[in-house]
Amino acid sequence: MTITSTNIIEETNYYGAHNYHPLPIVVSEANGVWVKDPEGNSYMDMLSAYSAVNQGHRHPKIIEALKNQADKVTLTSRAFHNELLGPWTKRMAKLTKKDKVLPMNTGVEAVETAIKAARRWAYQVKGVTENQAEIIAADGNFHGRTLNAISLSNDPDATKNYGPFVPGINKVSYGDINAIEKAITENTAAIILEPIQGEAGIIIPPEGYLKKVRELCSEKNILFIADEVQTGFARTGKMFACEWENVEPDIYVMGKALGGGVFPVSAIAANNEIMDVFTPGSHGSTFGGNPLACAVSMAAIDVIEEENLVNKSLESGKYFADKLRAVNFEGIKEVRARGLFIGMEFHQPVREICEKLKDKGILCKETHVNTIRFAPPLVITKDEMDWAIQRIEEVLTN
């Protein structure tokens, strides 16, 4: 029997939990910015697996690293050393300009690790009374799906019927420095922010906001945690989005593109004063820092650096965003962009537009009902962007 997209979608819906609402498309092959379905139809990927595929699908260098390491050793656990963890931690420390790195697997694991580090630091270094440490988070955030992460959230879709939530969290309006100042208490350990909010619809904070957050954290002896899981590794036209304001957080949270689109790799990076709160047995991960992850991750960073994807994202993002802004359609409210991290907000829900774009060969996804996120692999060419713009115009103007 020939397996069709319809068969696969029906089987997935029957046997799988319905915690996602994907477009009716099945991806069976991928290369660069393009994917194919089982019927052989080609589509341009404008989502990049939520920015996990910045280097393009199946980049040859990353796949080669994966295969070579898979032929040697894939997993040792942290009960033993492996020969790539040392070089990988050094590489990551140099990249982030931090003393130490702690490897995990998924983005939300890195978020959890950062918050645990901040709480321990508050008790052991700052002197907060035990079990009283507080974390400040911003409305509209997305830090993941664990109970701790959704405790930071104010999104009803993410939080409904999952309580009780983790205590010690104060929420403030994103972009409002005065709100942060009012939320700070003697027990505040850290503030966690996305430098640009992704799931909220590519929300860019007011100019100077991150710099003021950095200054306030330094003044009040609070840690600044930057969740760069989605914005990191060249997505916004900088290696890390904090660089748009020349800001250095106390803790970097990294993931997604760190794994080159082929393996889950995440990490936090911080200086010794923070990292030294961890002692054997206080935190861990069986798969974190495994040799396969290290090999893939170093190749993923090589690709970003060797192919100059930071500048490519910056230049391509400006070109693509300008083209989107020039589209003549009165339903468009605003186009927000940093590099190839682009949100096109409409005055109405956009699910139907995404489905029509799929029919034209473009895969993108709505976020928060009224916004389409355009975040193609950073290897996209000018000709490919022009191809996409033509079809976006056709859908919107017809």
From Swiss-Prot:
<dbReference type="GO" id="GO:0042802">
    <property type="term" value="F:identical protein binding"/>
</dbReference>
<keyword id="KW-0028">Amino-acid biosynthesis</keyword>
<keyword id="KW-0963">Cytoplasm</keyword>
<dbReference type="GO" id="GO:0004587">
    <property type="term" value="F:ornithine aminotransferase activity"/>
</dbReference>
<keyword id="KW-0808">Transferase</keyword>
<dbReference type="InterPro" id="IPR015421">
    <property type="entry name" value="PyrdxlP-dep_Trfase_major"/>
</dbReference>
<dbReference type="InterPro" id="IPR015424">
    <property type="entry name" value="PyrdxlP-dep_Trfase"/>
</dbReference>
<protein>
    <recommendedName>
        <fullName>Ornithine aminotransferase</fullName>
        <ecNumber>2.6.1.13</ecNumber>
    </recommendedName>
</protein>
<dbReference type="Pfam" id="PF00202">
    <property type="entry name" value="Aminotran_3"/>
</dbReference>
<dbReference type="InterPro" id="IPR050103">
    <property type="entry name" value="Class-III_PLP-dep_AT"/>
</dbReference>
<dbReference type="InterPro" id="IPR015422">
    <property type="entry name" value="PyrdxlP-dep_Trfase_small"/>
</dbReference>
<dbReference type="GO" id="GO:0055129">
    <property type="term" value="P:L-proline biosynthetic process"/>
</dbReference>
<keyword id="KW-0032">Aminotransferase</keyword>
<comment type="pathway">
    <text>Amino-acid biosynthesis; L-proline biosynthesis; L-glutamate 5-semialdehyde from L-ornithine: step 1/1.</text>
</comment>
<dbReference type="InterPro" id="IPR005814">
    <property type="entry name" value="Aminotrans_3"/>
</dbReference>
<dbReference type="InterPro" id="IPR049704">
    <property type="entry name" value="Aminotrans_3_PPA_site"/>
</dbReference>
<keyword id="KW-0663">Pyridoxal phosphate</keyword>
<dbReference type="GO" id="GO:0030170">
    <property type="term" value="F:pyridoxal phosphate binding"/>
</dbReference>
<feature type="modified residue" description="N6-(pyridoxal phosphate)lysine">
    <location>
        <position position="256"/>
    </location>
</feature>
<dbReference type="InterPro" id="IPR010164">
    <property type="entry name" value="Orn_aminotrans"/>
</dbReference>
<dbReference type="GO" id="GO:0005737">
    <property type="term" value="C:cytoplasm"/>
</dbReference>
<dbReference type="InterPro" id="IPR034757">
    <property type="entry name" value="Ornith_aminotrans_bact"/>
</dbReference>
<keyword id="KW-0641">Proline biosynthesis</keyword>
<comment type="similarity">
    <text>Belongs to the class-III pyridoxal-phosphate-dependent aminotransferase family. OAT subfamily.</text>
</comment>
<comment type="function">
    <text>Catalyzes the interconversion of ornithine to glutamate semialdehyde.</text>
</comment>
